[in-house]
Amino acid sequence: MKSIVVLFDEKNKYEEEKVFSDKSAKELCLSAAESFGFEVRTISGLSTISELLEELDKICSESGAESLIFSYADCLFLNKTLTQGLLSTHFDYKAEYTFAEGYPEGFAPEVLDKGTIAILKELSKTTAKATGDQKITRHSLMDIIKTDINSFEVETVLAPVDWRLFRFAFDCRKKETFIACQKLYESGISNEDAVELSEYAAKSAEILKTVPAFYNLQLAQKCQGQCTYCPYPAELLKKEGVKACEAAKVMSFDNACKLIDQIADFSGEAVVGLSAWGECFNNPDLLKIIEKILSYEGLSVLI
């Protein structure tokens, strides 16, 4: 049965970095995809799930492929053996959508029947339009399928150990995952063994802890709330002799900007929380601080 491999290229800033034995993640991913033995196409320039499905349906029609193997162009650890297992399960059980569960993200592609793609394309424009209009993410195909999941024959290839709790993502979409890829590649373990790679990653401090993805900033001492289990008022009174509801100190805009600049430089992509202790709305420069955070493409705000 004819299949085709499609890699979606997000054009992220790290995928072209030649740090993997003088090769980039994009080059290694393409090489891995070509080892599957099928035609490989790389697509880009799409923004919504609906647009993605439209393009995938078009590719199936043009190529005459009965099934489509989908992944992202920066997944340098794309695994041939795992992919073969997915295809075997997909065809043996006549599945419409097959994916790997429990393995780190970036090791396995997703497999779809061409008819499933056509159906999802229509769903993304009609009953599931709200999902279809969403920006493409690494979970887009599953997200659109979940809108009517009982209508599809979905099969799963399970990992021998559930590594999901580690939240691994071996791709190069951001600095955090890019560094993890570098450290895993430096281990020298063959890409052919997804289990050995996963076991190594789960024990490697360099992979588990790359750069922070979340920061908490306290913008104001004052807090009008009276939470039964909150230790903040008692500790503030003990250390500084002031009640939380009467505290007056706030972080200056200049100091906040310095911290935000350092966060952006160090982590690249991160969530900045503004509700560590105290009530951030007591800082008169709150809106300016939020604007400063959002001036960096890789930073977002949590209040």
Model-inferred region functions:
Residues E51-S67:
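Active-site nucleotide-sugar/metal-binding loop of Leloir-type enzymes
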Residues A65-L76:
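Short beta-strand-to-loop acidic/aromatic patch adjacent to the donor-nucleotide binding site
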Residues M1-S44:
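N-terminal glycine-rich phosphate-binding loop and ensuing alpha1 helix
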